[in-house]
Amino acid sequence: MNYLKDLKEQFTFDQLLLIFTCFSFTFPFYILGPILLIEFIYLLVSKKAIIALKQTPQIKFLYLFVLISLSISIIHKNILGALATLGIFIVIILMVYYRKHINQSTFEFIIDMLIVLSILWAIYGIYEQFQIYHRLGVDHFTFKVYARRENRLNSVFYNANYYAMMIEFIAVCTVYKFFTVKNNLKISIFYVIVGFLNLFMLYMTGCRAG
């Protein structure tokens, strides 16, 4: 509880909402989607999104893109295309709004949070891989990677390619943190270990990038 209290004192409500949004990207898409939609509705109802859009230069090009893309999808009865357009619009609105509220401390906190979370993803992913080996009757220490979707490592993301994408993002974050840490050998070693752990997990996902 004290930790949550410290967070409330350190960050504003909008910054905490941004942190939670970044945290929610670790959820499966069917949980992430409703969360982003609820945040989008909140920003519209509170008029915070409208104010942010008015203060954003060249925003008319975003409206034009959404209008053209949505019109083409509707004309061709492409429901998925229309939903994808709306999804992109919602994400851009959130980015435009939160750009006003992010600062260095918020950015650093989000990066560290995701790096720590990646360790938990890896632990669960290794457990999941052992379960796959057990189901297939394979020795647990063969480190064999399979191509079939049902035999690929997903961790908490329910999709191997999405997990691989998140690992690649975490790799960039660890490199950034490694080069920005000054005079702290233990922290530097920590980032190196986490980096190699995630590269190993990237290989185990079976993604081409691995």
For every predicted segment, state its role:
Residues 84-87, 154-158:
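Alpha-helical membrane-interface segments at transmembrane helix boundaries
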Residues 10-11, 85, 146:
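Helix-boundary and loop/linker segments of multi-pass membrane transporters
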Residues 19, 108-141, 155-210:
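Alpha-helical transmembrane segments of multi-pass inner-membrane proteins
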Residues 2, 96, 151, 197-198:
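Positions in alpha-helical segments
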Residues 141-152:
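Luminal/periplasmic active-site loops of membrane-embedded glycosylation enzymes
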Residues 1-80, 90-116, 177-192:
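Transmembrane signal-anchor hairpin modules in multi-pass inner-membrane enzymes, especially those
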